[in-house]
């Protein structure tokens, strides 16, 4: 039997609530990217379904994705839908094991089958394009000039709906492959926090990290109650480490103290 094509399944879920509140899936979709010859990736299977979350949809979530309780009343449940996310199309003996999403931690909290390998197009984007105006998938869609259709194999493509967002994320992922980011590197990037180019919250939103006072990073790491996104904590701690080392190098202290501080910073994840 021939080896199956290498497939990365880009998934997206719409939910009954907004993070960090507990929520259930009310719509699921995927768009496959398939590599048949080296680093040439093309679109494969496409699928989308409303999901009965067996719980009411919060009105704030409803205002984002426009999925109502009436729309999902007769839809299949999550337990009925989830196996489809693993099936290779056309259905074969092997299952999909490589998944991608934009902010993959959200999808993984809802769907993380044993043995799954994950790629995060958001973290890839920060790594490849730190100077992008934003790393949200719809912003990247237009910033990158992605040419996407309004209808995908009979499914309408709408922003803030599962298929529309999966389709955009798949386009972003394909561009990331084209620009030379290897799948193995993507997997490593997804498994670790990334250094954010700027924060998008609080009094210093949008500023360069170099323009933010040290006290703000100290507040994030030591004094605030959070909970913080791991990337935010990693960024704040990394900036503090760099600034402390810089101050030590400028101060007339014992060189062994500087070396010890550098070694301590290098040991941190």
Question: How should each PLM-predicted stretch be described?
Answer:
Residues 1-117, 121-123, 130-160, 227:
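Conserved non-catalytic scaffold segment of RNase H-like nuclease domains
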Residues 161-173:
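Acidic, divalent-metal-coordinating active-site segment for phosphoryl/phosphodiester hydrolysis
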Residues 75, 163-166, 210:
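Generic detection of long, well-ordered alpha-helical segments
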Residues 3, 171-269:
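Acidic two-metal-ion nuclease catalytic site recognized across multiple nuclease folds
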Residues 65, 129, 145, 170-174, ...:
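Generic helix-packing signal
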């Amino acid at each position: 039997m021939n080896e199956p094509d290498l497939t990365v399944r880009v998934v997206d879920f719409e939910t009954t609530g907004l993070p960090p509140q507990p929520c259930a899936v009310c719509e699921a979709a995927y768009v496959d990217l398939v590599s048949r010859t080296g680093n040439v990736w093309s679109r494969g299977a496409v699928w989308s379904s409303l999901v009965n979350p067996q719980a009411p949809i919060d009105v704030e979530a409803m205002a984002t994705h426009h999925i109502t309780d009436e729309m999902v009343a007769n839809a299949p449940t999550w337990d009925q839908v989830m196996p489809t996310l693993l099936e290779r199309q056309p259905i074969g003996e092997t299952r999909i094991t490589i998944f991608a999403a934009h902010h993959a931690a959200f999808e993984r909290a809802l769907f993380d089958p044993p043995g799954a390998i994950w790629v995060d197009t958001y973290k890839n984007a920060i790594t490849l394009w730190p100077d992008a105006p934003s790393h949200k998938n719809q912003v990247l869609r237009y910033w990158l000039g992605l040419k996407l259709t309004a209808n995908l194999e009979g499914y309408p493509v709408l922003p803030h709906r599962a298929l529309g967002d999966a389709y955009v994320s798949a386009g972003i992922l394909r561009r990331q492959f084209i620009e030379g980011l290897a799948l193995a590197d993507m997997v490593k990037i997804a498994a670790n926090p990334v250094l954010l180019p700027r924060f998008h919250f609080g009094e210093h939103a949008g500023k360069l990290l170099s323009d933010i006072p040290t006290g703000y990073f100290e507040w994030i790491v030591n004094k605030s109650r959070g909970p913080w996104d791991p990337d935010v904590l990693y960024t704040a701690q990394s900036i503090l480490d760099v600034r402390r080392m810089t101050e030590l190098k400028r101060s007339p202290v014992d060189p062994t103290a500087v070396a010890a501080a550098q070694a301590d910073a290098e040991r941190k994840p």
